[in-house]
């Protein structure tokens, strides 16, 4: 919503994200204050909350400028698992790139390249969590994440599935149960049909096999 408002205020002959350099510190601060105010309906009185919209990675520069205290978490899965999960999910709106194997592979590759850029521009500001490591080394990974966020450990951090909080994303069912491994390799059952996805991922897929 803040992003849409920012686009409406674009200075003539300027486009997002270039226009950000022409906005005053006062305007940027107002964007941040507007975001905090408009998200209160979802977080209530909670001092911290998570905005996990899937396209947030595109706006990390904007987020950093209007919410300088925000913690950026880059949650990743194996590229094939991530893309297959998106491909089989019917989203309520948007995310049109998920409806084609080539398209979602290209989008994921662009995401990886952009995240590499953000990590160079904002060193130490992005904390990456690899799902495959999380499911096998859960509590140490949770503690590492809490350390990055400057938060104390609470039992609810590892018993998140007992929460009755509102979840407005496609993962609403997953967060109601303990972390599990069964979803990691679902894509392999359809491997013979995922050629266009593998081709679109290219080197990103190869590098993931090396690092995971």
Model-derived regions: residue spans:
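Structured core elements
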Residues: 49-51, 71-76, 127-131
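ATP/adenylate-binding site constellation spanning eukaryotic-like Ser/Thr protein kinases
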Residues: 4-6, 69, 123
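Conserved phosphate-donor/acceptor-positioning beta-strand/loop module used by diverse small-molecule
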Residues: 63-85
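Short, solvent-exposed loop/turn segments at secondary-structure junctions
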Residues: 54-57, 78-81, 89, 132-136
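PAPS-dependent sulfotransferases, especially Golgi type II membrane carbohydrate sulfotransferases
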Residues: 16-22, 26-46, 86-128, 136-209
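Single conserved hydrophobic/aromatic residue that forms the stacking wall/gate
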Residues: 1-7, 11, 210-211
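Short N-terminal helix/helix-N-cap motif within the alpha/beta-hydrolase-1
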Residues: 58-61, 84, 139
